[in-house]
Amino acid sequence: DQPIGSQATTYLLSVVMPVVCWYTGIQPPSFFYYETMKIFLDTADTQLIQDGYNTGLIDGITTNPTLIMKSGRDPEEVYQELIDMGLRDVSMEVVGNRKEMYEEGMRLSNKFGKYATIKVPCTPDGLAVCKELSRQLIRVNVTLIFSVTQAILSAKAGATYVSPFVGRVDDNSFGGLCLIKDIANTYAKQNWKRTEILAASIRGVRDVGRAFEYGANICTIPPKVFNGMYNHILTDKGLELFDNDWKSVQKLGA
């Protein structure tokens, strides 16, 4: 058995700290890492997000300029609606040069507070902004990750999340899921626990399971893929069998 002091420490780190970090929206301290399988929705369609959020299984949202454009709405109206819905982690992408991204990131962080994760590209300017924001305990999601070296630089810049693009890597004849595995192995061998791997550009249900298997901490997926995670032909057959048997039982008792 663990000594009482050790038990108390374990309880603090495994139970109390995750609750505090989740409620306040702050990044855990460097010595602590609470690993879990989190699912984000990758969309700016608030109706689809509401449907997903109502399941109780969605942990956050990722957006980008393309998704916002498709929604046809003002981005900050979308962000506010998501926060009002109850979502506590919304990735808000900034664009421009270093100064423009930093100023916009600070403005969004000041406006939306602990609910905002500022999304920057993996470029010299983007990582410089990541460094500046993370020093102020602002969550940063570094996007457009296509290599382990980019994930290393992003981690050193203080990224909360790195977003490897699984589907786009596959499109270019490379192994997108293998990239997840390589980043996870690199972080593990270096005992790096401050940056979570957020698998992005996921296009199929099977890839969600494989991404988690290969070491992703989070998968951000389109609503269609999320809904497809429930489905399996054997589940349907089993339900049909149970339904027919239950009807037979009811007839016996009639």
Short names for language-model regions:
Residues F40-D42, K70, S91-N97, Y115-T123, ...:
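Catalytic beta/alpha-barrel core
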Residues F40-L41, D45-I49, T55, T63-E132:
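Active-site beta->alpha loop and helix N-cap motifs at the rims of alpha/beta catalytic domains
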Residues E81-D89, L127-Q136, C178-R194, N244-D245:
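Alpha-helix-loop-beta-strand connector modules within alpha/beta enzyme cores
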